[in-house]
């Protein structure tokens, strides 16, 4: 019976990945299609991916698959061929290749079955997720950006929007995708006559969001094919102006892909221009926040003097202080001025 899960420590796997000499390619993909038996599909894909030395994060549900992975460069074409052959629904699937990639995005393969591949909070039995808005490609995106009758809606979380977004795009302030969906409907009620263009990192969230908007009576809805990643790639290939400003936040060790030279965010500690996310080095905190190099040195990678002091304590004392605290890491939410519990590197399905 093959082993269908990882049995090596994270530290050992990360150390092994960091000394790998073979280049890797970071890839993301998704597909909404019916999977009759997600558990069996998960186990079969786990064996396929493991044989090709694929790392990353993969979610499966009855509604489809969502993956962010790292593949050895020498195995990319074999991976593509085997993925396409795995199920007719996956044949010809678009694979989003990372724009700014050092090959160190993942170091372990985690593959899970979930209720949804994106946690949307939708429980309306009449909702048709396949009734999506029209796709837009790079040139069409730029044309829409110049159309005064079009509104661009960013369907990413607040910390993603903070470091980069399309020109004049509207932020739907929320910590999770499930919070954004009803807010988007509410905020757009006065603009039902407008052309609504939705976008996200790789396309999975804005595709479902476009269907949700149509379900709620919005008729002129588009979404960007392949999200920010595919837009930027195609715009560059076609010699078009790239109209996304700043950095594209990604849900792996890189925490961002540089799209333009502009830095539109600021250090959460001193206010200097900066768009580099990090997690607080205090194991009892792990706050996700933006920190400039000066503050990183001053606070030793921590988010505050308190965390800096605590991280310098003996390990046993640190463990004692953490006992009984709320589990999970936090995200700095500048707009609300409070901390929010979530995963260390946020979960892209939330």
UniProtKB/Swiss-Prot annotation:
Active-site residues, record numbering mapped to chain: 200 (cysteine persulfide intermediate)
Molecular function in Gene Ontology: oxidoreductase activity, acting on paired donors, with incorporation or reduction of molecular oxygen
Pfam families: Rhodanese (PF00581), Rhodanese_C (PF12368), UPF0176_N (PF17773)
Family (UniProt): Belongs to the TrhO family.
Originating gene: trhO
Name this protein carries in UniProt: tRNA uridine(34) hydroxylase
Domain Rhodanese positions: 146-240
GO biological process, one term: tRNA modification
Free-text function comment from the UniProt entry: Catalyzes oxygen-dependent 5-hydroxyuridine (ho5U) modification at position 34 in tRNAs.
SMART domains: RHOD
Catalytic activity line of the entry: uridine(34) in tRNA + AH2 + O2 = 5-hydroxyuridine(34) in tRNA + A + H2O
EC number per UniProt: 1.14.-.-
Keywords: Oxidoreductase, tRNA processing
Keyword match Oxidoreductase: yes
Lineage, top ranks: Bacteria, Pseudomonadati, Pseudomonadota, Gammaproteobacteria, Enterobacterales
Top-rank lineage group of the source organism: Bacteria
Entry-linked Gene3D superfamilies: 3.30.70.100, Rhodanese-like domain (3.40.250.10)
Keyword Lyase tagged: no
């Amino acid at each position: 019976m093959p082993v269908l899960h990882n049995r090596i420590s994270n530290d050992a796997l990360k150390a092994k990945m960091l000394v790998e000499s073979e280049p890797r390619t970071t890839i993301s993909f998704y597909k909404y299609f019916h999977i009759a038996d997600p558990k069996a599909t998960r186990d079969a894909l786990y064996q396929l991916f493991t044989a090709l030395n694929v790392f990353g994060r993969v979610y499966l549900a009855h509604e489809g698959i969502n993956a962010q992975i790292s593949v050895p460069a020498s195995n990319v074409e074999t991976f593509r061929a085997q993925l396409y052959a795995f199920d007719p629904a996956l044949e010809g699937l678009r694979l989003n290749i990372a724009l700014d990639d050092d090959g160190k995005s993942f170091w372990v393969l985690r593959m899970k079955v979930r209720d949804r591949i994106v946690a949307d909070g939708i429980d309306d039995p009449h909702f048709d997720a396949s009734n999506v808005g029209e796709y837009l490609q790079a040139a069409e995106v730029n044309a829409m950006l110049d159309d005064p009758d079009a509104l661009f809606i960013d369907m990413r979380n607040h910390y993603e929007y903070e470091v980069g977004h399309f020109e004049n795009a509207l932020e739907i302030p929320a910590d999770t995708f499930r919070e954004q969906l009803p807010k988007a409907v509410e905020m757009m009620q006065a603009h039902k006559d407008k052309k609504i263009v939705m976008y996200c990192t790789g396309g999975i969230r804005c595709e479902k969001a476009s269907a949700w908007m149509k379900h709620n009576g919005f008729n002129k809805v588009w979404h960007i094919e392949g999200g920010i990643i595919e837009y930027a790639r195609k715009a560059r290939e076609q010699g078009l102006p790239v109209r996304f400003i700043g950095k594209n936040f990604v849900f792996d060790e890189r925490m961002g892909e540089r799209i333009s030279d502009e830095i539109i965010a600021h250090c959460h500690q001193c206010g200097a221009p900066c768009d580099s996310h990090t997690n607080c080095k205090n194991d009892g905190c792990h706050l996700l926040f933006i920190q400039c190099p000066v503050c990183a040195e001053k606070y030793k990678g921590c988010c505050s003097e308190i965390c800096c002091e605590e991280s310098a304590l003996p390990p046993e004392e640190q463990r004692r202080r953490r006992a009984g605290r709320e589990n999970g890491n936090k995200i700095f939410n500048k707009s609300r001025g409070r901390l929010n519990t979530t995963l260390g590197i946020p979960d892209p399905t939330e």
